[in-house]
Amino acid sequence: VNKKSRYYFSLDENIKQKIDLNKIYSNYQNFYGTKLNINQDEFIEKIKEIQKKINLDDKIKNINEGVGFPFIIPKLSSADIGSNIKNIFLPALKKSYKNKFQNYEFINHIKFDLSNKLDIRKESRYENIISKSLNEEIVGILYPCLNEYSFPAAHEVLKNLPEKFVLSGGYEIISALIGTPEMLFDKDKYTPLLWFSSMKNFDDENISYHIEPYGYNITLNERAHLNQAAEYWWHSLSILE
């Protein structure tokens, strides 16, 4: 962890006020390309219930002092992370981002087929999301709260949190962006790179994937992290219903 931060990279200071549950649900309806079993009222109720439970737990309630981005992961027919990201999440993100920012776009810099290329990092608890997504839609909240952490440091944080938390991965990060495409948009400041904290390249522990702003576009890419921390590298936690 970087112990002294310049706070050079940050989210829009007004982003919390821009989170609109009705608009988020509408974006999922419009861009996922599949019918959701959960309706809008149920989605809103589930998010409010998650927030209420967090606020009642003194050990974790401070996380709500930051910003959390609600998401829905659709029911998936495959456990192949790369295929799902390629075929379901990225097309929806491309449409949602262009709908919000007509002059900018989402760009995928990964030119190879992602199928069978992504794996779960040990002790990330992400197997909970993979297994649950095969049976039902998942509602939760993404908290990009581990600013300037390394992968090992993010894993250490998770060890001390209740089981309902997981290290965030591509499903929630991309889903949160589909719902709130302005999540990493700020015309005045630089916003951070978000690692898929629970994921790695299938063959190399030191390579992972991330969403990164570039100008006013957002991009998907991979890189080696070597278990280091950097001021523009952020990790995230997700909490599920």
Can you say where each PLM-predicted feature lies in the sequence?
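A binding-site-centric feature that preferentially detects glycan-recognition modules on secreted/surface proteins
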Residues: 1-166, 172-241
